[in-house]
Amino acid sequence: MFTKTAIELIKELRGTDSIPHYNDTSIKATIDEMIALYEDLIKTITEHKEQKKEPFYLQHAITFHNSINRDKRCILAYLNERLNRIKEYRWSSGQSLLPDQLKERLSQNEIQFFSEYDKILTEYNSKVGLDLTIDPQPPKELYIEVRVIKELGEVVLNSGCTVNLNLNTTHFLKRSDITNLVKNGSLEHII
């Protein structure tokens, strides 16, 4: 069946919200299929010039052409979705370095894309003077209650206040002061 491998690529992404391993084998197999379909299309068109207006040959050529386009659309959708997930990872994690477990699942081009995207985002953040990845949603409350999960001792917050963050203590602090501590797992937001 034509386009079977390409459709499997799309199904592979649907099965998870994370970024699966880059499926180089299926991409290459789909491209090889596209080349073979193109050669069959050219062969059908050139060998049957006198019969090219007959419905059978027209439908034959249209089938090859549509299969090539479907393969191409599936590959582009696969790659686009992976890039969207890479961008989403950068925004949600706030990290400018890829962890090894994620890096091994990406192709070289995707790793390069992440680096370039990170440079653009970091440069933009520095020009604006804000880290836009910290809170993509506006906060509902200015102060939040947090519990200390990792012993930090005395900490000076962004606002200039000093607070003693001892293990298992709870505090009512300004959200903007402790967002990074919540993100890195030192504090836990108590709801």
Curated annotation (Swiss-Prot):
<dbReference type="InterPro" id="IPR056783">
    <property type="entry name" value="PSF1_C"/>
</dbReference>
<dbReference type="Pfam" id="PF05916">
    <property type="entry name" value="Sld5"/>
</dbReference>
<comment type="function">
    <text>The GINS complex plays an essential role in the initiation of DNA replication.</text>
</comment>
<dbReference type="InterPro" id="IPR036224">
    <property type="entry name" value="GINS_bundle-like_dom_sf"/>
</dbReference>
<dbReference type="GO" id="GO:1902983">
    <property type="term" value="P:DNA strand elongation involved in mitotic DNA replication"/>
</dbReference>
<dbReference type="GO" id="GO:0006260">
    <property type="term" value="P:DNA replication"/>
</dbReference>
<dbReference type="InterPro" id="IPR005339">
    <property type="entry name" value="GINS_Psf1"/>
</dbReference>
<dbReference type="Pfam" id="PF24997">
    <property type="entry name" value="PSF1_C"/>
</dbReference>
<comment type="similarity">
    <text>Belongs to the GINS1/PSF1 family.</text>
</comment>
<dbReference type="InterPro" id="IPR021151">
    <property type="entry name" value="GINS_A"/>
</dbReference>
<comment type="subunit">
    <text>Component of the GINS complex which is a heterotetramer of gins1, gins2, gins3 and gins4.</text>
</comment>
<keyword id="KW-0235">DNA replication</keyword>
<keyword id="KW-0539">Nucleus</keyword>
<dbReference type="GO" id="GO:0000811">
    <property type="term" value="C:GINS complex"/>
</dbReference>
<protein>
    <recommendedName>
        <fullName>Probable DNA replication complex GINS protein PSF1</fullName>
    </recommendedName>
</protein>
